[in-house]
């Protein structure tokens, strides 16, 4: 896996780029992605490893905020029927963050959102392609500080919807075995 460090100005004008989200702060990466999608109308962006995105803040506080946001609109007889649909999976959470940064009510914003794909882990067809890291990973700076507080989107998902997370984790283990067979590792 080849990782390059690039700034936004050095991104190509057209084509497809793959961004490895491992260790990035979710909001900062989302601003880069939203800006690139709006400035370059023929550029497609694929974000992989969305479950490894980081949200800064106290772990308990972040998880409670997500739980409150989800349960605020629920009704007792059908939790998903009324109110806005709040995503729980890390890939959908990140896409929702980017959607909030785009002008989704006009054509430009809608087309930008259509050109964004977000995956948890790395799909097999993108395994050997170049992946970009847009800037110095801020998580490395956070780990140096002993009292730095952050939580990954996977941890948030595990605390919100354990059954779905557990099912994904089992599928992920099978997927890793399959990748090892294909790559011969």
From Swiss-Prot:
The keyword Ribonucleoprotein applies. One of its GO terms (biological process) is negative regulation of translation. Keywords: Ribonucleoprotein, Ribosomal protein. The keyword Cell division does not apply. GO terms for molecular function: mRNA binding; structural constituent of ribosome. This protein is one of the early assembly proteins of the 50S ribosomal subunit, although it is not seen to bind rRNA by itself. It is important during the early stages of 50S assembly. This is Large ribosomal subunit protein uL13. It comes from Pyrobaculum islandicum (strain DSM 4184 / JCM 9189 / GEO3). The lineage of its organism: Archaea, Thermoproteota, Thermoprotei, Thermoproteales, Thermoproteaceae. The gene is rpl13.
